Amino acid sequence: MQEVISYIQKAVLEISNALKFPDTSYSQNQNFTGDTQLKFDVLSDEIITKTLSQCSSIKAIISEEKDEILTLNERANFIVAYDPLDGSSLMDVNFAIGSIFAIYEEKANAKNLRAALYSMYGARLELVICKDQPKLYRLNANNEFIFIKDLKMNEKGKINATGGTQKFWEEKHAKFIKNLFDEGYRLRYSGAMVSDINQILLKGGGIFSYPATQDAPNGKLRAFFEVFPLAFIIEKAGGKTTNGKNRSLLELEFDKIHATTPCFFGSEYEISKLLKAYNE
């Protein structure tokens, strides 16, 4: 699996370099779920596909920007699912964005998730790698990823990052969010899931939520290459996740590679409070 991680690092570095002079315009194409693709979405996907295709340990790849699974080496063990550029719609305002990766063994499902990674393209290039404990790495002047620290969630946080169009929220969710603000929580929502999860993780706690809404009853975030890898990282850091019903997002099973789900990530206090609010 270390070979797979090494190739992911190469792809992340190439994307980071390309971001220095990006084309932020939209293409004429849409991805499988109907999102209009930025030209840099397509370029990032091409970079990752090209790089991971050179790794003999990868059986197949699944991308947010591809309609179907792409088989690379049937004799290999690992399947890599990824969002090549999460938050790409924020490129024109120069917000921090990132890439998300899940490494599955033999079959793509949460039970077979062996490692998860995400990169942050911000003021500096950082990479979080998680097999057992999430570890933060930072690119140095020699183009090497240097270990910075292990990441761990506190029992309770102060950050409230809540997505979904508010007018379409269910009453129970609106009430839950209001109660958090009444407790003194701070709104921190950028529109890039990876950036918001990263802030909660590095600050040690809080909650990220993207609930079921009237216009998206199954949520909008994709299980295999967004929800599962970030849930894996949060839970390995001591946090909790749920879809509002299950005790963990990693209990969920889906047949379609572009399946979506409501999702909540956070410290133990916030997720326990949410489950109570959702099941009263």
UniProtKB/Swiss-Prot annotation:
GO terms for cellular component: cytosol. It catalyses: beta-D-fructose 1,6-bisphosphate + H2O = beta-D-fructose 6-phosphate + phosphate. Substrate binds at residues 86-89, 189, 220. Binds 2 magnesium ions per subunit. GO terms for molecular function: fructose 1,6-bisphosphate 1-phosphatase activity; magnesium ion binding. Pathway: Carbohydrate biosynthesis; gluconeogenesis. Homotetramer. Keywords: Carbohydrate metabolism, Cytoplasm, Hydrolase, Magnesium, Metal-binding. It comes from Campylobacter jejuni (strain RM1221). Its EC number is 3.1.3.11. The keyword Acetylation does not apply. This is Fructose-1,6-bisphosphatase class 1. InterPro entries: FBPase_C_dom, FBPase_class-1, FBPase_N, FBPtase, SBPase. It is an enzyme of class 3 (hydrolase).
